[in-house]
């Protein structure tokens, strides 16, 4: 903000405080009770197309509230546009329609951003705009700071994220985005409840962070004198519940990962994670297709979902392709047999500019090659399958090829949206894979998993054949809201301290 802009702001704030002082002298400037009986959108939907004479004959009395977004003062009368949670409606406030002195002493002190309540009758102006002719008015909240420029809106991206309340006031698209977010969350919850899943809650603070390859946030519990971690995933606790006999469970909640911030990553994010006994990863891919198709129809009314330059088709069966096949398809001449040889795979990776870590085995190298040559090519909804066992420490090995797992990742628009697999329920194999993760961590991989002996003990009691999946809510909302950044779909995203 320039020095001149700051002086203008200070001057306007001073003027508003002077108005507030006058209002205080007349009574309470922040009354606590006004009972509306109508919302702007509902009034527009029912009466906007009604002829003026018919509307006059109907004599529709309303009580509405809202924030003043536009103001036109014309001597003894004024027009205001107010905005409530549903939309906007115009007010006509005339001195002669109000009690004596109210127009000058009350309405004359209103500013953009103030919140008012009015009672009146609906009518049409000469231009045909639905309007409330006000017979009684009340200031409910005095705004001491001005709104963003009414013509430009709130265009500064950083301010939109830091002061989300202003963004929501000024930008209809932002309000729409978070309505869509609410619909996505409630739609997912309803989808699983209708299919017999039980919603559960598992610890956010964990002594051993598990369930994903990620770097955790560390904290300390003073009373127990023990380091604890904000969870990176609820997976191991949810599978304990399946061991305990709850055959269908899900949790829709927050996870935390102490990693970078980007248009796709926020350190605090929301996921749905669910587990289904006596199902395999093919069943979960079917579930996912059904879920996304239903969300698209319920929220957008179509299975053709626009996103930037793309249009995703949720109406057709999603493509299913193995990691090796994807590399061969998009790898510009990479031979399948070279992906089965560690030396040749490393050579390919280095030619692609990949920095190969000493701790990587063949599976990790192949995964890095996939991320470099194929991941961004998976635009239409695609299930990537047959991940190397090395990078899938919790997934069941494939019966025909134990070097890969019965795992899938869902990609849309070149971005990972979900991850699922048939669960590893062999306790001895799980213990060995945890040991391999510990070795990788000791070798410098700070995203390798911790060993969770208690989880191995749970598996030793018997986990039935089970499949599980996690879906990123934020990235799903990005798709349905056509939002380019994850910050656009999180109400209060992580920001550098100002």
From Swiss-Prot:
- Catalytic activities: tRNA(Lys) + L-lysine + ATP = L-lysyl-tRNA(Lys) + AMP + diphosphate
Binding, Mg(2+) 2: 416
Identify the EC number(s): 6.1.1.6
Q: Which Gene3D superfamilies match?
A: Bira Bifunctional Protein, Domain 2, Nucleic acid-binding proteins
Where along this sequence does the record place binding of Mg(2+) 1? 409, 416
Keyword rRNA processing assigned to the entry: answer is no
**What CDD domains does this protein's entry cite?**
LysRS_core, LysRS_N
What are its GO biological-process terms?
lysyl-tRNA aminoacylation
Primary localisation category: cytoplasm
Q: Which UniProt keywords apply?
A: Aminoacyl-tRNA synthetase, ATP-binding, Cytoplasm, Ligase, Magnesium, Metal-binding, Nucleotide-binding, Protein biosynthesis
Q: How is the cofactor bound?
A: Binds 3 Mg(2+) ions per subunit.
GO terms (molecular function) for this protein are: ATP binding; lysine-tRNA ligase activity; magnesium ion binding; tRNA binding
Location of the protein in the cell? Cytoplasm
Q: Which domain of life is it from?
A: Bacteria
Outline the subunit composition.
Homodimer.
What name does this protein carry? Answer: Lysine--tRNA ligase
| Protein species of origin | Haemophilus ducreyi (strain 35000HP / ATCC 700724)
Gene of origin?
lysS
């Amino acid at each position: 903000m320039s020095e001149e802009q700051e002086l203008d702001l200070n001057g306007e704030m001073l003027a508003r405080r002077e108005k507030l002082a006058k209002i205080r002298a007349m009574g309470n400037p922040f009354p606590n009770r006004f009972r509306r009986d109508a919302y702007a959108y509902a009034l527009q939907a029912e009466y906007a197309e009604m002829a003026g004479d018919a509307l006059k004959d109907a004599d529709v009395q309303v009580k509405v509230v809202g924030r003043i977004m536009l103001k036109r003062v014309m001597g003894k009368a004024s027009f205001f546009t107010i905005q409530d949670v549903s939309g906007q409606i115009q007010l006509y406030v005339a001195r002669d329609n109000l009690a004596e002195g109210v127009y000058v002493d009350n309405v004359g002190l209103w500013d953009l951003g103030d919140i008012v309540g009015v009672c009146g009758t609906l009518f049409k102006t000469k231009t045909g705009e639905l309007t409330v002719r006000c017979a009684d008015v009340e200031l409910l909240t005095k705004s001491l700071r001005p709104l963003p420029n009414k013509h430009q809106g709130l265009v500064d991206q950083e301010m939109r994220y830091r002061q989300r309340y202003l963004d929501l006031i000024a930008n209809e698209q932002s309000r729409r985005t978070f309505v869509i977010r609410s619909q996505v969350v409630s739609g997912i919850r309803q989808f699983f409840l209708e299919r017999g899943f039980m919603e559960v809650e598992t610890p956010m603070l964990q002594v051993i962070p598990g369930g994903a390859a990620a770097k955790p946030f560390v904290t300390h519990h003073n009373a127990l004198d023990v380091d604890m971690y904000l969870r990176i995933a609820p997976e191991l606790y949810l599978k304990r519940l399946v061991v305990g006999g709850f055959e269908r469970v899900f949790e829709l909640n927050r996870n935390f990962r102490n990693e970078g911030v980007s248009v796709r990553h926020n350190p605090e994010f929301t996921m749905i994670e669910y587990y289904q006994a006596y199902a395999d990863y093919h069943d979960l891919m079917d579930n996912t297709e059904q879920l996304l198709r239903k969300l698209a129809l319920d929220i957008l009314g179509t299975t053709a979902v626009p996103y930037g330059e793309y249009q995703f088709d949720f109406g057709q069966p999603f493509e299913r392709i193995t990691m090796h096949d994807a590399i061969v398809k998009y790898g510009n001449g990479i031979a399948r047999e070279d992906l089965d040889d560690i030396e040749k795979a490393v050579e390919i990776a280095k030619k692609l500019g990949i920095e190969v870590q000493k701790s990587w085995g063949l599976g990790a190298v192949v995964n890095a090659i996939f991320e470099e040559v194929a991941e961004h090519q998976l635009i239409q909804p695609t299930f990537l399958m047959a991940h190397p066992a090395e990078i899938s420490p919790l997934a069941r090995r494939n019966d025909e090829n134990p070097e890969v797992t019965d795992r899938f990742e869902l990609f849309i628009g070149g971005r990972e949206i979900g991850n699922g697999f048939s669960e590893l329920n062999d306790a001895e194999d799980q213990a060995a894979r945890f040991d391999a993760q510990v070795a990788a961590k000791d070798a410098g991989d700070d995203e390798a998993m911790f060993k969770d002996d208690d989880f191995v003990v749970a598996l030793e009691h018997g986990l039935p054949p089970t499949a599980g999946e996690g879906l990123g809510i934020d990235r799903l909302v990005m798709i349905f809201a056509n939002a380019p950044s994850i910050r656009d779909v999180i109400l209060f995203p992580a920001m550098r301290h100002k």
